[in-house]
Design a protein with these regions (language model features):
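PLP-dependent class I/II
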Residues: 1-215
Length: 215
């Protein structure tokens, strides 16, 4: 949710922490092909599958919807060791059961060409850079955006409101939507940080920036 990319050192540290435990890992890797500022995407996305101590206990989750711009299709996958997959299916069959057949055939055919997902880093980095350049002209403080299609900002310099209240005000008064990062904390921890999504047409981003520069 924070547009942070875990490094190899981070993953090794997690592996060390989990090693003496029986904890299972849910590794959400739906943005695996959206990593910025690197020579190649593969050099920076560190999947749990690459670390034996993590792979043995991990449910690795990814999304065809986010990779291929078809989020409305609600199609993804989970990779896990055979013993864990058996248990996963017992639960999953009652939640979803299956994905419709035409969508599965369509994705299988589309995946034959790797170019669409290999082009994602450059595609989204250009949008990120466009959005960040415009935000530099506001009083919002930019936080790093290393991957995904999200940009987090600190609102302390522009408002005393709590994150959720600020997001509601921003939508109502300026017509720009943001997400309060406190929504991702069980206790609603508020750091005065909100998140924008830049997976939009350039004209939409430029319109939003024009409004945000009034803050």
């Amino acid at each position: 949710p924070s547009a942070t990319v875990w490094s190899r050192a981070d993953m090794l540290a997690l592996q060390d922490i989990l090693d003496p435990t029986d904890i299972l890992l849910i590794s959400d890797e739906v943005y695996e092909h959206m990593v910025f500022d690197a020579p190649t995407q593969e050099s920076t996305h560190e999947s749990a599958a690459r670390f034996p101590g993590l792979a043995a206990r991990a449910f690795i989750v990814s999304s065809f919807g986010k990779t291929y711009h078809v989020t409305g299709w609600k199609v993804g996958y989970v990779a896990a060791p055979a013993a864990l997959t058996v248990e996963f299916r017992k639960v999953h069959q009652f939640n979803v059961f299956t994905v419709n057949t035409p969508v599965q055939y369509a994705l299988a055919q589309y995946m034959a060409d790797p170019q669409p997902y290999l082009a994602l880093p450059a595609f989204y980095q250009r949008k990120r850079d466009l959005f960040r350049d415009g935000l530099q002209k506001t009083r919002l403080r930019l936080l790093p955006s290393e991957g995904t299609y999200f940009q987090c900002v600190d609102i302390s310099a522009v408002s005393d409101l709590k994150e959720a209240d600020f997001c509601q005000w921003l939508t109502t008064e300026l017509g720009v939507a943001a997400i309060p990062m406190s929504a991702f904390y069980g206790d609603g921890f508020d750091q005065r940080v909100v998140r924008f999504c830049f997976a939009k047409k350039d004209e939409t981003l430029l319109s939003a920036l024009e409004r945000l520069q009034k803050l």
